[in-house]
């Protein structure tokens, strides 16, 4: 199940979900959620306008591949990734699958071109938003490296909620 098709989050994240029941009647009443239209956009979960802390921005002073980023990142409405030797634009308007090692190196972190033409990586909060966490979710007091890892290891909240709602309905019917 892809998060963009089953969770209304702009992320390409395919996962297999296994649901089991002890009672065959509950199983007979259960069905996995159906695909849904993606309504949320990148700008619903990522703030392209607001100035973030300087540590999230790339420049010629702190990034050895900044010249390539600057040359190739032109679109302010999409996500980019540094792929070890080249810049990849995700033309699907979806964030690529967030990974647990986003905070440990430069090649897995989704990048954006902000509205004021600055290049930056997603903040931990934005990564959690891409996973479907609500705006008001309070992030734990941890290092950004740990927060990126937690976001990358997370399940997509709306997908899990839809599956759980279907489980509750199946059990309630028996």
Sequence positions of predicted segments:
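Class I S-adenosyl-L-methionine
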Residues: 1-97
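C-terminal target-recognition/interaction regions appended to catalytic cores
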Residues: 58-174
